Amino acid sequence: MELPIYYPLGLGALLFGLGLWGALTQKNAVRILMFIEIMLNGVNLNLITFSRYYWQTSPEMAARAPILTLFVMTVAAAEASVGLAIILAMVRNRGVVEVDKATLLKG
């Protein structure tokens, strides 16, 4: 018995929506970064789902989806490390983590 496609796609959309909601409503920079990572995980889940379910109609696209997912994971790791470095610099210079209070990064 095969899992219907709308289960993993729904979960991916839910993860993306939750990440988007959190990134737009939070004021803490670390939380915003975490919600952006949740959004990227939702995108990765949808990529793998489409690869799994449509490999018969387009085998070359099915082979590219895991590679694209690894690329997205690599970019997400780089984005997280740069984002955490910026947040750490913001805390050292301004003493705040809230995005609203840190309007200038000049220091």
Swiss-Prot record:
Keywords: Cell membrane, Membrane, NAD, Quinone, Translocase, Transmembrane, Transmembrane helix, Transport. It comes from the Bacteria. The keyword Cell membrane applies. Its EC number is 7.1.1.-. It holds the Pfam family Oxidored_q2. It is found in: Cell membrane. GO terms for cellular component: NADH dehydrogenase complex; plasma membrane. The keyword ATP-binding does not apply. It catalyses: a quinone + NADH + 5 H(+)(in) = a quinol + NAD(+) + 4 H(+)(out). One of its GO terms (molecular function) is NADH:ubiquinone reductase (non-electrogenic) activity. It is a multi-pass membrane protein. The chain crosses the membrane at residues 3-23, 30-50, 67-87. One of its GO terms (biological process) is ATP synthesis coupled electron transport. Its main location: membrane. NDH-1 shuttles electrons from NADH, via FMN and iron-sulfur (Fe-S) centers, to quinones in the respiratory chain. The immediate electron acceptor for the enzyme in this species is believed to be a menaquinone. Couples the redox reaction to proton translocation (for every two electrons transferred, four hydrogen ions are translocated across the cytoplasmic membrane), and thus conserves the redox energy in a proton gradient. NDH-1 is composed of 14 different subunits. Subunits NuoA, H, J, K, L, M, N constitute the membrane sector of the complex. Belongs to the complex I subunit 4L family. This is NADH-quinone oxidoreductase subunit K 2. The gene is nuoK2.
